[in-house]
From Swiss-Prot:
The chain crosses the membrane at residues 31-51, 75-95, 151-171, 222-242. Pfam families: EI24. HAMAP family: CysZ (MF_00468). Disulfide bonds: none annotated. InterPro entries: CysZ_sulfate_transptr (IPR050480), Sulfate_CysZ (IPR022985). This is Sulfate transporter CysZ. High affinity, high specificity proton-dependent sulfate transporter, which mediates sulfate uptake. Provides the sulfur source for the cysteine synthesis pathway. Keywords: Amino-acid biosynthesis, Cell inner membrane, Cell membrane, Cysteine biosynthesis, Membrane, Sulfate transport, Transmembrane, Transmembrane helix, Transport. The lineage of its organism: Bacteria, Pseudomonadati, Pseudomonadota, Gammaproteobacteria, Enterobacterales. It comes from Escherichia coli O139:H28 (strain E24377A / ETEC). The keyword Cell membrane applies.
Length: 253
């Protein structure tokens, strides 16, 4: 079925909402199962462990607050909790996406075919196996781009005052952008668009992608809802690709 989407781009909030609708479309649900199972097993277990550690980590993080900011501790405490959830939420999400990357790519490909009526290359288990080395190389490129920037932000967390006030905001913005890259890359990679070219394309609609990534980041922190976020984000990002980028970058039509 060809999508009824218009070619006019919408907001990132719109595409995130579309992801929740598209994930349950007939013919798409079977491609959602494996990414969903990976996410439920990993994110469910990881966040259960994380919440058991908060009582230890939050006081440690708050110990870096200087004496002159102690009067703000009632505000800094929730910021510290959010900071831990953001950092580890993205870390857990990255691991889940590495494991599920071949299946996320297949989900993006099949959804794009349904939305556009285009014919994708031959797929199946052998097609996935053949593409695994290329897909893992692409995941490594994303990780190599992310890691040095994340280290700088983590160092900022240990600067008294700044680490408890400015760093959580910077990390949220960085996480939003990185999650937009993570999920939008699946349809781009299906069309063999180079990683650098993909990032350049996303920057042309930076506000839209930041909106999409911000909502994805927020939902990654919410128990239960974060179990479903991976296939939802893949579907939303694929809808954005169809509307905003496909005309210029598509390899198959």
């Amino acid at each position: 079925m060809v999508s009824s989407f218009t070619s006019a781009p919408r907001s990132g909030f719109y595409y995130f909402a579309q992801g929740w609708k598209l994930v349950s479309q007939p013919g798409i649900r079977r491609f959602v199962i494996l990414p969903l199972l990976v996410n439920i097993l990993l994110m469910g277990g990881a966040f259960w462990w994380l919440f058991t550690q908060l009582d230890v980590w939050i006081p440690t993080l708050m110990s870096y607050v200087p004496d002159w900011l102690q009067w703000l501790s009632y505000l800094l405490w929730p910021l510290a909790v959010i900071s831990v959830l953001l950092v580890f939420g993205y870390f857990f999400s990255t691991i889940a996406n590495w494991i599920a990357a071949p299946f996320n790519g297949l989900l993006a490909e099949q959804l794009e075919a349904r939305l556009t009526g285009a014919t994708p290359p031959d797929t199946g288990i052998f097609g996935i196996m053949k593409d695994v080395p290329r897909i893992m190389k692409r995941e490594w490129q994303k990780f190599a781009w992310y890691l040095p920037r994340a280290i700088v932000l983590l160092i900022i967390y240990f600067i008294p005052g700044i680490g408890q006030t400015v760093a959580p905001v910077l990390w949220f913005l960085f996480s939003a952008w990185m999650l937009a890259i993570q999920y939008c890359d699946y349809p781009f990679d299906n069309h063999k668009v180079p990683f650098k070219e993909m990032r350049t394309a996303l920057r042309t609609r930076k506000i839209t992608n930041m909106q999409f990534g911000a909502l994805t980041s927020l939902f990654t922190m919410i128990p239960l809802l974060n179990l479903f976020i991976m296939p939802v984000a893949v579907c939303g990002a694929t809808a954005m690709w169809v509307d905003c980028y496909r005309d210029k970058h598509a390899m198959w039509r």
